[in-house]
């Protein structure tokens, strides 16, 4: 075995190695472990901390850290083996990109303590199996990466590792059509198994190729599997639809190509030390170790309740990209690109909740790779996760706050990368999925608001011929619904919501001002005495404003009026909103004061639509008020959620469907059904809240409203002619269809349970083709 | 190690109850205090920013005790602790209206707390400030009285 590590020395001979050769004479210990024995509990806690630190780039030598850890273990922890193994497992699960460091630690212990090595191997194999049984697929991926690295550290034998990999791939072996296995085992499971094996190959491929004759067969199995599989989900989950300049690939296809290229280069060591191999520094020591045979894995089989990690499409904006500072992004098909992404993703996953810490770690990581444009890759990974379909792992603001923080820390690098990324996305907007439109607008408006809305607006405005800020009453001209026009319009409105009208007029250049709607003031039409209802409005205004009339008095005035019932509702609504128009608080106060009056007036659908019409008329120029006031009316139980849905899809709101706020409102409406405890009255105990939200009634109501929404989508789309490409009607149909897909994505857990109902809808006769395709693709993806 | 959702060192001196009761309410609270706002920042802007962390239950604007105009702070209440934590994490220390705003746990809004506690009606910090802050009425109240005693009677 001795020559193994000596040979692998040629992977890299780094400064670190040199440092190690010099150091022993004047070694500075990181720990006082030899000085003082710690009590058990403190020792375990310290060990946990040090193990976590192995995944952190902080300038300390990895070798020193590893040596210290093994001394620390021998001095303090021999009796706490189970605790140590548990900590080890949690580390390898959280930090799969650092599996080699953890494996080296075990390798070092295994030399003097064969028993520990044996226990570790058995513990991890057990953990691998149980995590798969429990559907903890991400965990088993981390453990698998660790076990493979154990081979690199001379802890496990080559043959037993090959057996394990073969066992993983056994379900991917080509099956004849109609064969039972392919019927029962879903592709998601086989994809995941293949992914687990494939992702370990960059670090272990070379050794296995040299040592095992069966490795070729394994690669062949993978190749055939990947080439033959049909990634049906790719079209649906891609952020870019066909025709975009940005290449995007199914994650498994891409990884295969990256590994295949690596194999064709005789497993050339990835550049820039993207693969950590801390064990190389200990090769003499490790080569003396005895190895263990991995016990055979009894693979848990697929069951009815198994759920697998969803397939992904890899997001790319910086293809064939040379960064402004002359650094070259690793080519898309290089394994370097994959490794870079994986390591950035891991930092994000572990630290995303603490934006400052996360930024520190990302900056340190970038610093450790000065010859690579890591900043660009960080921006690409963050934007990619934020826009990910069907949904992003965390809220948009989480990603935005990290990018803002990074921009503050590295003002010469990150803002430029964000700018380039945004420019590329903007150029490709036409082919971007509607389902991530809102996330992009929300992110970007927030990002700009943190930097004084400073942007090269003029340049963006140039290519955009689309006309004015749309009012629902206006006729719209061609180009109004063009994606870029819609995007700029919505972006500028969102910026204004975070800022104020006057500021936007100062920030925007002349050629962009037409995107800014008029100041968002209320429009009280009953000021005109000739409008029907004006007289009643005068009486109400005078009573409410002049003498703060009681609800009973208002009811009397309304009863005394000879106006039609629906007109009365409209007048009453507009008067209340007009009086409260100063702020949300003022509006809510007025509505609350006269809540009983509204409840007497309003029961049926048409009556509820009348109050909504009142809101939309008075606040025609202020989308945020429309959305917030209607949501409040639902919470006050003056209006029912189901009638807000029918209102939104009513013919008179056709143009409004091209705007973001209406979807904001629709989502908020669904949330009120999902969380009935949030309806007034105010305070409820946590127990009542839980009981309310877990009620069967709630589930039925949620299903009801979500199904109703799909029905409405189908109906509104069926009633529209699509028109030629480039026409407003074409854009409109594409957009609304994209919104339907967004709903399926956001509430996929609920829609999954309504599979048969969705199938039924998709089989209706007069459906638009795109609608059928969207529903069917969703069903194929989730079932 | 400290995290963004830990309690800060600030304690409201007007809290009715013991220090440990206060800390318990802070730990369970879904209400946030938001400070260092511009006097011109509106409830609508605050709603826009904070609703990106979750559904906002209520916003109470901080007002000058005498003039009843915004005086640079507010309370934001969410439905759940998780939503409030998101605001602590992702909004605290970021910009609104070009100002770095402060977000901190609050034990819960009680009527009367919406008013500034300074002698002149605004927040105490705006009385002792020595810098010029256009978003918060220029110089601190005490200083501006010294500088221009005759022009402050508008």
Curated annotation (Swiss-Prot), chain B:
<dbReference type="GO" id="GO:0099523">
    <property type="term" value="C:presynaptic cytosol"/>
</dbReference>
<keyword id="KW-0694">RNA-binding</keyword>
<protein>
    <recommendedName>
        <fullName>Nuclear cap-binding protein subunit 2</fullName>
    </recommendedName>
</protein>
<feature type="binding site">
    <location>
        <begin position="113"/>
        <end position="117"/>
    </location>
    <ligand>
        <name>mRNA</name>
    </ligand>
</feature>
<comment type="similarity">
    <text>Belongs to the RRM NCBP2 family.</text>
</comment>
<dbReference type="InterPro" id="IPR034148">
    <property type="entry name" value="NCBP2_RRM"/>
</dbReference>
<keyword id="KW-0507">mRNA processing</keyword>
<dbReference type="GO" id="GO:0030422">
    <property type="term" value="P:siRNA processing"/>
</dbReference>
<feature type="binding site">
    <location>
        <position position="10"/>
    </location>
    <ligand>
        <name>mRNA</name>
    </ligand>
</feature>
<keyword id="KW-0508">mRNA splicing</keyword>
<feature type="binding site">
    <location>
        <begin position="123"/>
        <end position="124"/>
    </location>
    <ligand>
        <name>mRNA</name>
    </ligand>
</feature>
<dbReference type="InterPro" id="IPR027157">
    <property type="entry name" value="NCBP2"/>
</dbReference>
<dbReference type="InterPro" id="IPR000504">
    <property type="entry name" value="RRM_dom"/>
</dbReference>
<dbReference type="InterPro" id="IPR012677">
    <property type="entry name" value="Nucleotide-bd_a/b_plait_sf"/>
</dbReference>
<feature type="region of interest" description="Disordered">
    <location>
        <begin position="1"/>
        <end position="23"/>
    </location>
</feature>
<comment type="function">
    <text>Component of the cap-binding complex (CBC), which binds co-transcriptionally to the 5' cap of pre-mRNAs and is involved in various processes such as pre-mRNA splicing and RNA-mediated gene silencing (RNAi). The CBC complex is involved in miRNA-mediated RNA interference via its interaction with Ars2 and is required for primary microRNAs (miRNAs) processing. Also involved in innate immunity via the short interfering RNAs (siRNAs) processing machinery by restricting the viral RNA production.</text>
</comment>
<dbReference type="GO" id="GO:0005634">
    <property type="term" value="C:nucleus"/>
</dbReference>
<dbReference type="InterPro" id="IPR035979">
    <property type="entry name" value="RBD_domain_sf"/>
</dbReference>
<dbReference type="GO" id="GO:0031053">
    <property type="term" value="P:primary miRNA processing"/>
</dbReference>
<dbReference type="GO" id="GO:0035194">
    <property type="term" value="P:regulatory ncRNA-mediated post-transcriptional gene silencing"/>
</dbReference>
<feature type="binding site">
    <location>
        <position position="33"/>
    </location>
    <ligand>
        <name>mRNA</name>
    </ligand>
</feature>
<dbReference type="Pfam" id="PF00076">
    <property type="entry name" value="RRM_1"/>
</dbReference>
<feature type="domain" description="RRM">
    <location>
        <begin position="30"/>
        <end position="108"/>
    </location>
</feature>
<dbReference type="GO" id="GO:0000339">
    <property type="term" value="F:RNA cap binding"/>
</dbReference>
<feature type="binding site">
    <location>
        <begin position="102"/>
        <end position="106"/>
    </location>
    <ligand>
        <name>mRNA</name>
    </ligand>
</feature>
<feature type="compositionally biased region" description="Basic and acidic residues">
    <location>
        <begin position="9"/>
        <end position="23"/>
    </location>
</feature>
<dbReference type="GO" id="GO:0045071">
    <property type="term" value="P:negative regulation of viral genome replication"/>
</dbReference>
<dbReference type="GO" id="GO:0045292">
    <property type="term" value="P:mRNA cis splicing, via spliceosome"/>
</dbReference>
<keyword id="KW-0943">RNA-mediated gene silencing</keyword>
<comment type="subunit">
    <text>Component of the nuclear cap-binding complex (CBC), a heterodimer composed of Cbp80 and Cbp20 that interacts with m7GpppG-capped RNA. Interacts with Ars2.</text>
</comment>
<keyword id="KW-0539">Nucleus</keyword>
<dbReference type="GO" id="GO:0005846">
    <property type="term" value="C:nuclear cap binding complex"/>
</dbReference>
């Amino acid at each position: 075995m001795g020559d193994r590590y000596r040979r692998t020395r040629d992977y890299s001979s780094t400064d670190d190695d040199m440092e190690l050769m010099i150091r022993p004479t004047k070694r500075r210990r990181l720990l006082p472990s030899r000085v003082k024995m710690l009590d058990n509990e403190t020792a375990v806690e310290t060990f946990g901390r040090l193990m976590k630190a192995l995944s952190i780039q902080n300038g300390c030598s990895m070798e020193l850290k590893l040596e210290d850890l093994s001394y620390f273990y021998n001095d303090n922890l021999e009796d706490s083996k189970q605790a140590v193994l548990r900590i080890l497992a949690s580390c390898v699960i959280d930090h799969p990109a650092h599996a080699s460091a953890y494996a080296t630690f075990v390798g070092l212990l295994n030399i003097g303590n064969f028993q520990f090595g044996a226990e570790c191997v058995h513990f991890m194999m057990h953990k691998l199996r149980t995590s798969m049984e429990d559907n903890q697929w991400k965990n088993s991926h981390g453990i698998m990466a660790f076990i493979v690295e154990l081979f690199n550290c001379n802890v496990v034998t080559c043959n037993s590792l090959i057996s394990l990999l073969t066992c993983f791939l056994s379900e991917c072996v080509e099956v004849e059509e109609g064969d039972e296995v392919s019927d029962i085992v879903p592709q998601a499971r086989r994809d995941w198994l293949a992914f687990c094996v494939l992702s370990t190959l960059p670090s272990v491929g070379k050794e296995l190729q040299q040592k095992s004759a069966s490795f070729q067969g394994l690669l062949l199995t993978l190749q055939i599997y990947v080439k033959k599989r049909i990634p049906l989900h790719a079209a649906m989950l891609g952020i870019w639809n066909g025709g975009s300049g940005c290449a995007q690939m199914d994650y498994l296809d891409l990884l295969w190509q990256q590994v295949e290229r690596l194999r064709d280069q005789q497993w050339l060591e990835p550049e820039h030390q993207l693969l950590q191999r801390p064990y190389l520094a200990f090769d003499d020591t490790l080569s003396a170790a005895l190895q263990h045979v991995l016990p055979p894995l009894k693979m848990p089989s697929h069951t009815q309740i198994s759920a697998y990690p969803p397939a992904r499409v890899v997001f790319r904006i910086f293809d064939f990209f040379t960064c402004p500072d002359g650094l070259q992004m690793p080519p898309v098909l290089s394994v370097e690109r994959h490794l870079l992404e994986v390591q950035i993703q891991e930092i994000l996953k572990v630290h995303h909740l603490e934006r400052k810490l996360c930024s520190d770690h990302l900056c340190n990581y970038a610093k450790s790779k000065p010859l690579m444009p890591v900043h660009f890759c960080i921006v690409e990974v963050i934007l990619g996760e934020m826009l990910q379909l069907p949904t992003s792992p965390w809220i948009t603001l989480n990603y935005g706050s990290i990018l803002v923080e990074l921009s503050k820390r590295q003002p010469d690098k990150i803002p430029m990368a964000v700018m380039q990324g945004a420019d590329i996305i903007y150029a490709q907007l036409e082919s971007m999925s509607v389902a991530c439109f809102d996330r992009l607008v929300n992110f970007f408006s927030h990002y700009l608001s943190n930097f004084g809305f400073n942007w090269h607006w003029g340049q963006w405005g140039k290519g955009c011929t689309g006309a004015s800020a749309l009012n629902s009453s206006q006729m719209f001209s061609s180009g109004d619904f063009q994606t870029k026009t819609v995007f700029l319009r919505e972006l500028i409105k969102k910026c204004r919501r975070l800022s104020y009208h006057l500021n936007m007029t100062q920030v925007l250049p002349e050629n962009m001002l037409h995107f800014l709607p008029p100041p968002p003031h209320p429009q009280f039409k009953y000021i005109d005495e000739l409008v029907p209802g004006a007289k009643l409005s005068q009486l109400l205004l005078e009573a409410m404003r002049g003498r703060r009339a009681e609800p009973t008095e208002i009811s009397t005035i309304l009863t005394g009026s000879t106006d039609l019932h629906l007109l009365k509702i409209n007048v009453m609504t507009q008067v209340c909103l007009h009086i409260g128009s100063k702020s949300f608080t003022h509006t809510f106060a007025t509505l609350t004061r006269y809540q009983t009056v509204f409840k007497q007036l309003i029961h049926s659908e048409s009556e509820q639509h009348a109050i909504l019409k009142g809101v939309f008329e008075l606040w025609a120029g202020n989308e945020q008020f429309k959305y917030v006031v209607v949501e409040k009316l639902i919470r006050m139980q003056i209006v029912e959620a189901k009638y807000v849905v029918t209102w939104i899809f009513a013919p008179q709101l056709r143009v409004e469907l091209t705007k973001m706020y209406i979807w904001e409102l629709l989502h908020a409406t669904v949330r009120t059904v999902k969380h009935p405890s949030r309806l007034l009255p105010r305070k409820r105990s946590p127990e009542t809240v839980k009981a309310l939200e877990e009620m069967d009634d709630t589930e039925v109501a949620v299903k009801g409203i979500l199904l109703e929404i799909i029905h409405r989508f189908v109906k509104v789309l069926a009633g529209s002619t699509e028109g030629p490409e480039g026409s407003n009607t074409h854009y409109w149909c594409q957009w609304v269809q994209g919104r339907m897909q967004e709903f399926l994505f956001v509430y996929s857990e609920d829609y999954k349970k309504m599979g048969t109902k969705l199938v039924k809808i998709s089989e209706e006769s007069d459906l638009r083709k795109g609608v059928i395709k969207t529903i069917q693709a969703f069903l194929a993806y989730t079932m | 190690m400290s995290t963004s959702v830990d309690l800060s060192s600030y304690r409201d001196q007007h809290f009715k109850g013991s220090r440990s009761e206060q800390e318990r309410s802070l730990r369970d609270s879904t209400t946030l205090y938001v400070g260092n706002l511009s006097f011109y920042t509106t409830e609508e802007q605050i709603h826009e920013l904070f609703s990106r962390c979750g559904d906002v239950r209520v916003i109470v604007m901080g007002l000058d005790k005498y003039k009843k105009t915004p005086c640079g702070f507010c309370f934001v209440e969410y439905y759940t602790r998780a939503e409030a934590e998101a605001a602590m994490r992702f909004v605290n220390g970021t910009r609104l209206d070009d100002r770095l705003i402060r977000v901190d746990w609050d034990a819960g809004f009680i009527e009367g707390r919406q008013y500034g506690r300074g002698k002149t009606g605004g927040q105490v910090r705006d009385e002792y400030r020595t810098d010029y802050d256009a978003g918060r009425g220029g110089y601190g109240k005490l200083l501006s009285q010294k500088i221009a005693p005759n022009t402050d009677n508008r």
